[in-house]
UniProtKB/Swiss-Prot annotation:
This is Potassium-transporting ATPase potassium-binding subunit. Pfam families: KdpA. It comes from the Bacteria. Keywords: Cell inner membrane, Cell membrane, Ion transport, Membrane, Potassium, Potassium transport, Transmembrane, Transmembrane helix, Transport. InterPro entries: KdpA (IPR004623). It comes from Bordetella pertussis (strain Tohama I / ATCC BAA-589 / NCTC 13251). HAMAP family: KdpA. The gene is kdpA. It is found in: Cell inner membrane. NCBIfam families: kdpA (TIGR00680). The keyword ATP-binding does not apply. Part of the high-affinity ATP-driven potassium transport (or Kdp) system, which catalyzes the hydrolysis of ATP coupled with the electrogenic transport of potassium into the cytoplasm. This subunit binds the periplasmic potassium ions and delivers the ions to the membrane domain of KdpB through an intramembrane tunnel. It is a multi-pass membrane protein.
């Protein structure tokens, strides 16, 4: 780990941790309906939306009604996004004349954006019209992030309230998170990105003549304009040689902002944040990294204020930061080593800069390694380099961060409610060790609570490992693997880990835009998101109904270094026990190969 990376990491964490308390306090005020600097313009719009939808924001919901409202809203979102994709060939704002998206790809994409995953088996500039990008995908970037915040707030209310039967109102939480948090921040960030050169227009694509002919592979399309596959399910491609380069345009900055702030991750372009029209320079790169973790870090402060003890939120944030710093250092160390090919050719002594394969020269190894750590610490999935080109052990960092459940900061809302499940597990383990009934924030942790916590922690590993096994055993699953051997297994494992944990990044050597992977990954995304959310809401309902117990002398404090260490240990231990065998078959085996 060199001085460049260390300086970048320290600068990043300093800005992030200074901004988190300010935003965290604002989120608490906004969600609770208190007056903020945005109330003057936001409140009339908020009230108008309630009247239009026939919603009483003061009507409290128990956890079941809260869950039903959330599920209905998200199912309707899937239907809307699917319909817009299928019909885009007949809809306006389609200057490239792109046809409707294939049914399996449209369903996968609809589930992906509604679940805050933003897994993309397609290239945005050659698949989605401007209308689809704006009305379908960008809208879901807002409301999927707001859904995560709403579910977290319901859990925090469950911890803060006592002897209560309700958790708040889903519709009010959704609207306030969107109006007072996501929209203003996205507007500010979009303007900042435009100032750095990010594209924002509705112009047709521009064709430019290149000096040198280019040769590339493109998907073979049928008469309906859909990708064709061979007998074994592998994608069919054609070689194209041309001197014409198409420069895609579009409303990029407005989607880029919420893609990052909402930890969504789906790029307007296929190259995502490695594309110069999405992420032009080092300043925009720093802004994008800060945007990804800003709200997840701030929500820790919101949690502390809502439960009446800021130190509770600081302890959770400290555990997240310790884990994040360790993974970031690991990624940087392995990526700053020469590649095995250079070392074998005895060129390592002359090589400078480490593993530059798959990295943009304008960012370099340090910024790419940090971005990869940031995007997989959050359930974001945006990338500024090719994760598939990371070294075998360098690629373990993004992979393992996802497999730990996206709780190292994590997604907007989802990261903190996942980490709170680990916090309850940690105090449960501590209670067993000292022979006391476990308590967290004055709430006794009982059988139902631990059942829900176990479901939250074990649901995604089950989906990841079962899905990987299915893909490896199926002919259609193996047909999508570009690289044989251990790395091919890693590509499948990464895809399932990304989908089930709602991250969305990929080892892009896997050809995943096939009916097999669109269905398999779609199921992983859906159940990986909503199994956990329903379990979290059930846990919140159980905790809200409990009386608050007075602090006892022998109770374990949940604000000090001991608790932080126990929480970090619980996260790492569960991850190690669950995924070490799979990691041994993939990246570890690849690293040990001659």
């Amino acid at each position: 780990m060199n001085a460049d990376f260390l300086g970048l990491l320290l600068l990043y964490l300093a800005i992030l941790l200074c901004a988190a308390p300010l935003l965290g306090r604002h989120i608490r005020q906004a969600i609770n309906g208190e007056r903020t600097w945005l109330t003057a313009w936001g409140q009339p719009l908020e009230r108008g939306l309630y009247r239009l939808a026939g919603v009483d924001p003061a009507a409290e919901m128990d956890w079941r009604r809260y869950a039903v409202a959330m599920l209905v809203f998200n199912v309707l979102g899937v239907l809307a996004v699917y319909a817009l994709q299928r019909l885009q060939g007949w809809l306006p704002l389609n200057p490239a004349g792109l046809p409707g998206v294939a049914p399996d790809s449209a369903l996968n994409t609809a589930i992906s954006f509604v679940t805050n995953t933003n897994w993309q088996g397609y290239a945005g500039e050659s698949t989605m019209s401007y209308l689809t990008q704006m009305l379908a995908l960008t809208v879901q970037n807002f409301v999927s992030a707001a859904t995560g915040i709403a579910v977290l707030i319901a859990l925090v209310r469950g911890l803060a309230r006592h002897s209560a039967a309700t958790l708040g109102n889903f519709w009010a939480d959704l609207v306030r998170a969107t109006l007072y948090v996501l929209l203003p921040l996205s507007f500010i960030l979009a303007l900042a990105l435009v100032s750095q050169g990010v594209v924002q227009n509705l112009d047709p694509y521009v064709e430019a003549q290149t000096v040198q002919a280019q040769q590339y592979e493109t998907a073979r399309l049928d008469a309906q304009g859909q990708p064709m596959t061979g007998p074994a399910g592998q994608p069919l491609t054609d070689t194209v040689v041309t001197r014409v380069q198409t420069l895609p345009m579009g409303p990029v900055a407005s989607q880029e902002a919420i893609k990052l702030l909402g930890t969504n991750g789906g790029g307007f372009f296929n190259a995502n944040s490695a594309h110069p029209y999405e992420n032009p320079n080092a300043w925009s790169n720093l802004l994008e990294m800060l945007a990804i973790l800003l709200i997840p870090a701030a929500l820790c402060w919101t949690f502390g204020e809502m439960v009446g003890s800021r130190r509770q939120g600081v302890a959770i944030l400290a555990a997240m930061t310790v884990l994040f710093a360790g993974f970031a250092a690991s990624a940087a160390y392995f990526e700053q080593q020469p590649t095995p090919a250079l070392r074998q050719a005895e060129a390592a002594l002359l090589a400078d800069g480490g593993n530059l394969e798959g990295k943009e020269a304008r960012f370099g190894v340090a910024a790419t390694a940090l971005f990869a750590t940031v995007t997989t610490a959050a359930s974001c999935g945006a990338v500024n380099g090719m994760h598939d080109s990371f070294s075998a052990l360098g690629g373990v960092t993004p992979l393992l961060q996802m497999q730990l459940g996206e709780v190292i900061y994590g997604g907007v809302g989802s990261g903190l409610y996942g980490m709170l499940a680990f916090a309850i597990l940690a105090v449960f383990i501590a209670g067993l060790m000292i022979g006391r009934t476990p308590e967290y924030l004055g709430k006794k942790i009982e059988a139902l609570d631990m059942q829900m916590v176990a479901l939250v922690i074990l649901a995604t590993p089950a989906l990841v490992l079962a899905g990987t096994a299915v893909a490896v055993l199926a002919d259609a699953g193996r047909a999508g693997v570009l690289n044989p051997g251990a790395h091919g297994f890693s590509e499948i494992l990464y895809a399932m880990s990304s989908a089930a944990n709602n991250n969305g990044s990929a080892f892009a050597g896997l050809s995943a835009n096939t009916p097999f992977y669109n269905v398999l990954l779609g199921l992983a995304m859906w159940f990986g998101r909503y199994t956990i959310i329903v379990a979290i809401l059930a846990l919140a309902g159980s905790l809200a109904a409990k009386p608050r117990l007075p602090a006892s002398v022998g109770g374990m404090p949940t604000t000090g270094p001991l608790f932080v260490a126990l929480l970090v240990g619980a996260v790492l231990l569960v991850g190690a026990l669950t995924y070490v065998p799979a990691l041994a078959l993939g990246p570890v085996a690849e690293h040990l190969q001659p």
